From Swiss-Prot:
Its main location: cytoplasm. Signal peptide: none annotated. This is DnaJ homolog subfamily B member 6. Residues 249-326 are annotated as: Disordered. Keywords: Chaperone, Cytoplasm, Nucleus, Phosphoprotein. The gene is DNAJB6.
Length: 326
């Protein structure tokens, strides 16, 4: 029979914190989306890890498991009075994906290096994934709810955080949202982030609404791919954000097709040629000279015409002289 303590790799006297750490590490290790080459085994391990955590993280379930084993949970206990067992009608294990979502419900695993240690900055002010320390620790944001534990601690600055994830066949997706607002109406800021895995690539969409302006940034594997402000592509803001991130600006492809048309000056000629003043002068001289000279073929045509007219006049004179003789 499976031993849940062995599944999580903890001692029987392990604390609740030790059990959380063990589940966090193993759930991320055996998540099926992280093991596409060995998905069948990963699904089995992922399910066992979820079962072990679901039992050992709950004091009542853990007590029954310690006394009666897994059968005590499923079949309502191995003996004794029904009053000793709150699961007298049997305990049903939840879907391992639901356990995973609940555990990471207060944080978006994609907002830092996924499959690392996403809760390290929640407990005891430990160092976070980007090297910053959280002085508030677990007292400021609860590990699962994500909302302020003490609403009156910051009366002039309210913050909210929500998050959920979806573990479907199309890949691992998640969503998180934060909002900040002071006592006045002009300081509101809302930030929402959604992330999904598409063909092995992490696509992150960040939506920022501040003082009536909406800014949407789309990243692919950490590289900014597009940026819009109020629904319009903004090349200048895109380039500025790339500089801020130290990212080489990619060729900008605006979503608005009107921006693809190049600017054409009103008085610009249809064809433009580049030449210097000497060439202009030579061309002008040549043009004037050619206009003064009679082309060869035109001169021949004129000469022939004169001869024909002269011949016609001579024939007319002969006819007149002949008539006069009669």
């Amino acid at each position: 029979m499976v031993d849940y303590y062995e599944v999580l790799g903890v001692q029987k006297h392990a604390s609740a914190e030790d059990i959380k750490k063990a589940y966090r590490k193993l759930a991320l290790k055996w998540h099926p989306d992280k093991n596409p080459e060995n998905k069948e085994e990963a699904e089995q391990q992922f399910k066992q890890v979820a079962e072990a955590y679901e039992v050992l993280s709950d004091a009542k379930k853990r007590d029954i498991y310690d006394r009666f084993g897994k059968e005590g949970l499923i079949n309502g206990g191995g003996g004794g009075s029904h009053h000793d067992n709150p699961f007298e009608f049997g305990f049903t294990f939840r879907n391992p994906d639901d356990v995973f979502r609940e555990f990471f419900g207060g944080r978006d695993p994609f907002s830092f290096d996924f499959f690392e240690d996403p809760f390290e900055d929640f407990f005891g002010g430990r160092r976070g994934p980007r090297g910053s320390r959280s002085r508030a620790g677990g007292s400021f944001l609860s590990a699962f709810g994500g909302f302020p534990a003490f609403g009156n601690a910051f009366p002039s600055f309210d913050t909210g955080f929500t998050s959920f994830g979806s573990l479907g066949h199309g890949g691992l997706t998640s969503f998180s949202s934060t909002s900040f607002g002071g006592s006045g109406m002009g300081n509101f800021k809302s930030v929402s982030t959604s992330t999904k895995i598409v063909n092995g690539r992490k696509i992150t969409t960040k939506r920022i609404v501040e003082n009536g302006q909406e800014r949407v940034e789309v990243e692919e594997d950490g590289q900014l791919r597009s940026l819009t402000i109020n629904g319009e592509a903004n090349e200048e803001a895109f380039a500025e954000e790339c500089r801020r991130r130290g990212q080489h600006a990619l060729p900008f492809q605006p979503t608005n097709t009107r921006l693809l048309k190049p600017h054409k000056p009103a008085s610009s000629p249809r064809y433009a040629y580049h030449y210097n003043s000497d060439e202009v002068e030579e061309q002008e001289k040549s043009r004037v000279a050619s206009s003064l000279e009679t082309p060869f073929y035109l001169s021949g045509y004129k000469e022939g015409s004169k001869r024909r007219k002269q011949k016609q006049r001579e024939e007319q004179k002969k006819k007149k002289s002949t008539k006069g003789s009669y």
